[in-house]
Amino acid sequence: MSQQLARTRLAYARTWHHLSFATDPRPLGRIASSIALHLMGKHKPIYDPSTDCGDYVIATSCADINTTGKKRYQKLYYTHSTRPGSLKSMSMDNMFKKWGGGEVLKKAVRGMLPKNRLRDKRLARLKVFEGEDHPYRKNVVKIDGKTVNNDKIGHSGETLDAVLQMKNELPPEKVGVAQAST
Amino acid sequence: MTRIRRGYIARRRRTKIRLFASSFRGARSRLTRTIIQQKIRSLVSSHRDRDRKKIDFRRLWITRINAVIRGNRVSYSYSRLIHNLYKRQLLLNRKILAQIAILNRNCLYMISNEIRS
């Protein structure tokens, strides 16, 4: 019976999340992990591994991706063309220069998605941009000027509950409102 | 000895098996020898998967509860919720918690806030 609950188009509709590296100080891997969860749909109570219930994620300002330590200059990305002797490596800094921060983010997220037939489809829902401009402004839903993100993909994301509470749809208790501490 | 044909004995046995596999795809519902093998395989699958079903659904419920619980607060998780549930001796099982998570998310938040001591 739990498979038939909430089988509505609204529940399975894909939402668009926006994330800007200019305002988010978290390092590359931590953000990539959160992005991968959203691409899989694991932030939803109707999650099912057989259906692709993931969402879209727009990542802007990828040129400002933050990494700790000396990873930027020491982390190597390897490619091999299956021809003997064709192992090539490129440091993360050179990746940024040649392909941009978007590719670095995509490589990170790709490794965090489950390796199955849905991996490429889910990765295609990650839209990366080097600057702040992106053509999907109309897809990101806003209520009263605040982006409706029901989860924490943004750094200090306003939760859906906080937005609904502003509109007096929730009782004014501590129920469900994100606590900044703890 | 006079010659004795087997008659319809084997055919009756095989028809029963053929009825079982009547909805299978391709040769699996048409060819007798294949039908016998596929019936055995399908019964084995259903026997094994009756136990897998219980395991699989519990895993799915846990994933769903985790999804909703983590959306609420920064450092809360399914494991902490279950720990608090057992500490307060609340008898809600994962199936019910998962249904509450789908249908009435605020109710689940209320429960988790109450038992969070």
From Swiss-Prot, chain B:
**Entry GO CC:** chloroplast; ribonucleoprotein complex; ribosome
Query: Where found in the cell?
Result: Plastid, Chloroplast
Q: Does the keyword Ubl conjugation apply?
A: no
Primary localization class, coarse: plastid
Recite the UniProt keywords alphabetically.
Chloroplast, Plastid, Ribonucleoprotein, Ribosomal protein, RNA-binding, rRNA-binding
Q: Which GO terms describe its molecular function?
A: rRNA binding; structural constituent of ribosome
Under the heading InterPro entries, the entry gives: Ribosomal_bL20, RIBOSOMAL_L20_CS, Ribosomal_protein_bL20_C
GO BP annotation list: ribosomal large subunit assembly; translation
Q: Does the keyword Protein biosynthesis apply?
A: no
Q: Family per UniProt?
A: Belongs to the bacterial ribosomal protein bL20 family.
Q: What does this protein do?
A: Binds directly to 23S ribosomal RNA and is necessary for the in vitro assembly process of the 50S ribosomal subunit. It is not involved in the protein synthesizing functions of that subunit.
What NCBIfam families does the annotation carry? rplT_bact
Read off the PANTHER family from this record.
39S RIBOSOMAL PROTEIN L20 (PTHR10986)
Q: Can you say what this protein is called?
A: Large ribosomal subunit protein bL20c
Source organism lineage? Eukaryota, Viridiplantae, Streptophyta, Embryophyta, Tracheophyta
